Amino acid sequence: MKYWIRKLAICIVLLCSLFLPTDYAGANQLSNSSNIDVQQLNALPAVKNSASVDNNLTEIRKEDFCRFNGTVNRIDKLEGLFTIYCSDDSGKIYLEIKPEQLNKDYLAIVTLESGVGESGIYSGLPLSDFLFYFRRVNNRLHFVVRNVKFRTDSRAEQRSLARSFSDSVLYSLDIITINPTNQNILINLNELLMQDFPGLSTLLKYSLQADYRLDARKSYFGDMNSFPENVEIDSIYGFSSLEGSNLVTVPDSRALNLKVHYSFSQLRENNGYIPRLADDRVGYFITAFQDFSNKNPHESYVRYINRWHLEPADPNAPLSPPKKPIVYWIENAVPLEYRDAIREGVLMWNKAFEKAGFQNAIEVQQMPDDADWQPADVHYNTIRWFNSLDAGFARGPMRVNPFTGEIVDADIIVDAKMVRLVQQEYHALMEANSSFDGHSFQVGKNPCQVLWGSQELGARNQKANTNNYLLSSSEFCYSMESSDQAAMGALALSILPDTAPSSETMKEYVHQYLRSIIAHEVGHTLGLRHNFHGSTMLAPEELNNTEITHTKGLVGSVMDYLPVNIAPQGVQQGDYFPGVVGPYDEWAIEYGYKKNPSATLEAIIPESEKSFLEQIALASPQPELSYATDEDIWDMNPLANVWDMSSDVLVYSQWQMDNARFMWQRLDKGYLSKGESYSNLRLRFNGVLKYYFRNASLLSKYIGGQSFQRLHASDDAAWAFVPVSLLKQRQALTKLQEYVFAEDAFSFSPELLNQLAPSRWEHWGSSAPNNRLDYPIHDRILSLQSAILRSLLDSDRLNRLQDIELKTLPGQALSIPELLDTLQTGIWTEVFALGEPKPISSIRRSLQREHLSILLQMMLGTTNTPEDGRTLAWYELRQLQKAIDVRLKQVSQSLDIYTLAHLEASGDRITKALNAQLLSR
């Protein structure tokens, strides 16, 4: 029997050799030159009779070889980092892995190549990037994500780490066959990439609030290629949902397709790159890990900045071109009219690199229309253009070597909506964010949270505020607010001057806007984090001086979230957006990229650069180099803001609120063109109102505020925290009283209010409100007044005021009693003022009731108010009760019924609350 089995095996091998002569020879040649892994040999069938090992092994190899070649025969072959076999008939894709590629680290970059154009599912968004390796376990191949968070130089501790912290085995794959001549492993790539590898089902559930399931029958592979250093693969996933969602951009929301691009590449090793240590005074994204061999008792983490590998061609020259510049490609999908602005935004950074010793460190090239590569290819840094219904954002993600922090890839994505709508009637850009629910309006900590929800916008905007699984809250906020800023600039451009802007003026405005956006995103791809202190470099009177802004810069850093620079009335308009990078940007690039002179003399390790880097970082106390990033703007620091400008926000905010009032006057005088819908007037009115309160909210950060600098002990004698001066705090309170709480803070003519009609279009992408149609002016004003008032009296601020009394000399701090008394006398002026009685307007009555409610909540302990705040609220209520009683006794006969009822009801509320508090004790 064995004889016939052996004969049959020989016949099969001969048949295979007839059909596969070339591959067979090639395989034998590889076998002679390759080193067969012992682990792979152990997986072969055991041979009991040692005398026949050679013969049996030869037969087994021939059978396995025939099975291997029978699988990949007559299908397309792509050779490269990993060899890919593509079967058009079956749709199967096979991946060939060499023995030496097992247990070796590779970088995976996953990108959403096509989306649905709304609700956070946008083309070009990064999905993930991580380090992985293939590990063979018996007859299966594991796809394992490497744990890079813990490291050590000690061999003994490495054994401990391996037991203590696990890698993540994402998939266990069947080994289809093994080539016996070279031990190459063949796997079915469908098992890996035709599953929901990137977790899109979770993304869709989060973003669309619906259950979508991957449908294998609708999923398939798209373009793919294999290069010597990387493999590029497209997977198209079909998703189905029984009920669907409220997507409006697809024909039927029960089914949709998403394309995902995978880039698997080998890590660049021994290329001379030296990781650079991070410093908290300079804002870089970092690669951090815990080093168990670090003997420093105060710090177990090692932090490297993320940066490109940039080396001077001439190390001895003070200014040298790089050996290999950083190249950005403008995608061929970018409209022609925007390419110059994008190019300028990228090249703005060459000025900063000159301070680091590099000439023309960055280059920009145009992607050909017939390019044979994809924008998501790891070898190309591409500025991409996409379209959406509801996004309006740009993003600049980068991918790094997780061992060293070396940036290996960066792609910037820009939504066409950011610039397209600026050119289509200036009001149109505001439409996406024009309405708001004032109860969600938050101020005093992070004005970025002033996101206006919308009944007028309908379900689409409600989703937009809750989706964005792929975008952080700050990124999504930037997208919303940046669009608003551009809209306000365009609206101001058309309203504030006596004449309408020319097409050239509007073109220049759009050019400046897009250039600024690109510069900001390129900064991220160079490794830089946000710097929300960057907008405070110039004094208010310098903002429109182009002799300064064209040389030194409009701001200290383009990495801030910058508002449009609108000149006050009577001042000639300067730059709307920055055209050059600022001093902080130059200094940060110097820290990250300047060549260490010692590097040419000896081998450099990161720790040996500490003194060199410290000399650069010592400049941090200079005002124009101040740094505050995302986690800093939640504090009450009036100089660490988003959407502010100048070193004196008090003056800047007043200028912008005056501009808003002037725009209201222009709208009141009949701004609409003949035949234009009154709904456009409502959009503009809303936009100006939002702009007004955004600037008012900046003032609240002065109350109990303090500046913060990331100083080190050797920097200088300055303090890390410096409370805002008492004078500035009092000025801020005065401005808030004048522009927010005063009786005449808001004055709109009946004619204007009666023209604020809503849009009545009802179709996909546009929802008409089904509630009251007229403009709810009382609710809008009160909700925003209430937001600012509540922020002034929240527990965090009162605790801060209490602490600051211990941090300043006597008499130099704004006390809680002064804050409460100033607000009460300003809001209840009609009660405390002497003289003839005046009727209290409806807007003032609403504000006074809100103020009273806040004090009652503080006193009755329904909030986290500190004890001193609670007793002071009791005191203020007693004073208010007495003042109301006195006023009613003096002038009750001459008061109108609105005012009389309001005062009597307010006094009664206070009396009942005071009595209730006494009973509770």
Which residues fall in each region the model found?
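Conserved catalytic/binding loops enriched for acidic/polar residues
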Residues: 497, 504-509, 534-921
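Bacterial N-terminal signal peptides that target proteins for export
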Residues: 2-10
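Auxiliary tRNA-acceptor-end handling modules of aminoacyl-tRNA synthetases
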Residues: 30-334, 352, 356, 361, ...
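Sec-exported extracytoplasmic/periplasmic mature domains
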Residues: 347-358, 388, 523-524, 528, ...
